[in-house]
């Protein structure tokens, strides 16, 4: 929730992939069971986050990645291509071979707070 607040308050920019939107939609639909509410919540995500596409080149380059999970490797390639600063995930272990910066939500919030203190 704190990361959503940081994005809402424009302390950082949140980016999701189009694939992430379909995953979120699926999870919300399974837990809420109300199509209108799910669509309302997903629309809110569109107001908070930028949504980026994954290109075929992201998928191709991911095949050469040391990250064995293809979905995670594609995420790294997409993040790198769009110029993201980092990936925030609860699954740090899945990205241990990544040369791209990856943080847990807690680590990201700590980093964000440190950067705010430097700017003040």
Residue ranges and their predicted role:
Residues 16-20, 58:
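Short, conserved alpha-helical segments within structured domains
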Residues 50-92:
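Active-site neighborhoods of divalent-metal-dependent phosphate/nucleic-acid chemistry enzymes
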């Amino acid at each position: 929730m704190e990361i959503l607040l940081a994005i809402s308050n424009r302390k950082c920019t949140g980016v999701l992939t189009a694939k992430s939107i379909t995953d979120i939609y699926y999870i919300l639909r399974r837990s809420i069971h109300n199509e209108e509410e799910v669509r309302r919540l997903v629309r809110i995500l569109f107001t908070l986050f930028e949504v980026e596409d994954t290109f075929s080149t992201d998928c191709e380059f991911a095949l050469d990645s040391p990250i064995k999970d293809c979905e995670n490797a594609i995420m790294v390639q997409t993040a790198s291509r769009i110029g993201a600063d980092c990936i925030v995930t609860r699954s740090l272990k899945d990205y241990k071979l990544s040369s791209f910066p990856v943080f847990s939500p807690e680590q990201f919030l700590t980093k964000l707070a440190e950067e705010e203190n430097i700017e003040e």
